[in-house]
């Protein structure tokens, strides 16, 4: 399979984030009227958080020291806090040709593996789950409605994770990252293609997600959500970004007009 075939760097490939699908679902299904919180021995925050998986996986990568810069936006409406797309996307940051190629190759591999038709690469589906982020250190919990973009389901309607891996990239590094994403989507099966430097798939393999210890990532996510809830005012925004020198997160109150510049909101 040649992942370079059909690639055009002049075509913008921006798929809708999972948060976009989640908004549509909530609006059409009267979602929150059917939502019941689970109170137990953990002190649960007063807010319900709504986000796409991207937000949580970016924080998880930060706890592993992956130097992948991001800046996300949180917006509060009454007792619901929406955490959406990377703030840098709002200013329409120009992607490098290499970044565009990485996006294209991943989308094309998923389409070729499922429908065989990669004419519409931005057509995706989402799975929505209620996740409780528990911090045992602070005895606190956060309710999160998380939307994950998925490309395939098995015969039991369970989501399947599909990825592309560079042939010289460590499998153990990849499986840890993929497994955290699978944990959020509820998937246990991962299908991945191994590509060479010319973007040709040399092998397709299947594995299961591993139950590795994600406590440091979950604690960091809990701390981020706690700080957002503490800082954010009703109908206001807070931006969050990592500081790789201090190994901590930075928070900034920003003007709500940022939201109006993004098609994702």
What is each residue range found by the language model?
Residues 1-265:
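Accessory terminal regions of nucleic-acid processing enzymes
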């Amino acid at each position: 399979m040649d992942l370079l075939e059909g690639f055009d760097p002049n075509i913008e490939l921006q798929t809708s984030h999972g948060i976009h699908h989640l908004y549509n679902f909530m609006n059409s299904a009267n979602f929150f009227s059917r939502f019941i919180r689970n109170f137990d021995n953990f002190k649960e925050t007063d807010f319900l958080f709504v986000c796409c998986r991207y937000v949580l996986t970016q924080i998880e990568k930060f706890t592993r020291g992956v130097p992948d810069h991001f800046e996300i936006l949180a917006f509060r409406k009454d007792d619901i806090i929406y955490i959406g797309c990377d703030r840098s996307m709002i200013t329409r940051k120009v992607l490098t040709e290499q970044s565009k190629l990485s996006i294209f190759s991943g989308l094309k591999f998923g389409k070729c593996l499922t429908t065989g038709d990669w004419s519409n690469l931005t057509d995706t589906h989402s799975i929505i789950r209620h996740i409780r982020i528990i911090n045992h250190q602070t005895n606190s919990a956060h309710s999160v409605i998380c939307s994950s973009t998925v490309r395939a389901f098995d015969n039991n309607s369970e989501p399947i994770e599909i990825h592309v891996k560079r042939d010289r990239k460590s499998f153990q590094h990849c499986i840890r990252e993929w497994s955290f994403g699978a944990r959020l989507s509820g998937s246990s099966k991962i299908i991945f293609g191994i590509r060479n430097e010319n973007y040709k798939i040399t092998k397709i393999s299947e594995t299961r997600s591993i139950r590795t210890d994600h406590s440091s990532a979950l604690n960091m996510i809990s701390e981020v959500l706690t700080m957002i809830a503490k800082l954010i005012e009703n109908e206001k925004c807070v931006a969050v970004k990592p500081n790789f020198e201090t190994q901590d997160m930075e928070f900034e109150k920003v003007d709500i007009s940022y939201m109006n510049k993004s098609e994702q909101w």
